[in-house]
Curated annotation (Swiss-Prot):
<dbReference type="GO" id="GO:0005737">
    <property type="term" value="C:cytoplasm"/>
</dbReference>
<dbReference type="InterPro" id="IPR020592">
    <property type="entry name" value="Ribosomal_bS16_CS"/>
</dbReference>
<dbReference type="InterPro" id="IPR023803">
    <property type="entry name" value="Ribosomal_bS16_dom_sf"/>
</dbReference>
<comment type="similarity">
    <text>Belongs to the bacterial ribosomal protein bS16 family.</text>
</comment>
<dbReference type="GO" id="GO:0003735">
    <property type="term" value="F:structural constituent of ribosome"/>
</dbReference>
<dbReference type="GO" id="GO:0015935">
    <property type="term" value="C:small ribosomal subunit"/>
</dbReference>
<protein>
    <recommendedName>
        <fullName>Small ribosomal subunit protein bS16</fullName>
    </recommendedName>
</protein>
<keyword id="KW-0687">Ribonucleoprotein</keyword>
<dbReference type="GO" id="GO:0006412">
    <property type="term" value="P:translation"/>
</dbReference>
<keyword id="KW-0689">Ribosomal protein</keyword>
<dbReference type="InterPro" id="IPR000307">
    <property type="entry name" value="Ribosomal_bS16"/>
</dbReference>
<dbReference type="Pfam" id="PF00886">
    <property type="entry name" value="Ribosomal_S16"/>
</dbReference>
């Protein structure tokens, strides 16, 4: 069973709130999950300590069992001070390298 560490959306329309969950990779985004390991509230200021709350010990456990975080969750985990496995770091670097930068509307009109 492939396991992912990802965000599950909650909250109301225009007021998102996310849970950081451990879920089967084939489960729906807001469907069943194995464990809740944190929260993310994008409505709070970026310097607010309650914006991202993670259970570091449980995340370390799941990473050691082979769970793969999504890109956004991997960024949260790194900021929290948890070291990511080498294979996850490498995947993130490859994705960032292959990401295409599109010109803005202003740049495309100017040329």
């Amino acid at each position: 069973m492939a396991v992912k560490i990802r965000l599950a959306r909650g909250g109301a329309k225009k007021r998102p709130f996310y849970r950081v969950v451990i879920a089967n990779a084939t489960a729906p985004r807001d469907g069943d999950f194995l464990e809740k390991v944190g929260t993310y509230n994008p409505m709070l200021a970026s310097d607010n300590s309650e914006r991202v709350v993670l259970k570091k010990d449980r995340i370390e456990y799941w990473l050691s069992t082979g769970a793969k975080p999504t890109e956004r969750v991997a960024k949260f985990i790194e900021k929290a001070g948890v070291t990511l496995p080498k294979n996850v770091k490498k995947e993130m670097e490859v994705k960032a390298k292959n990401r295409k930068v599109r010109p803005s509307k202003k740049e495309s009109k100017e040329s």
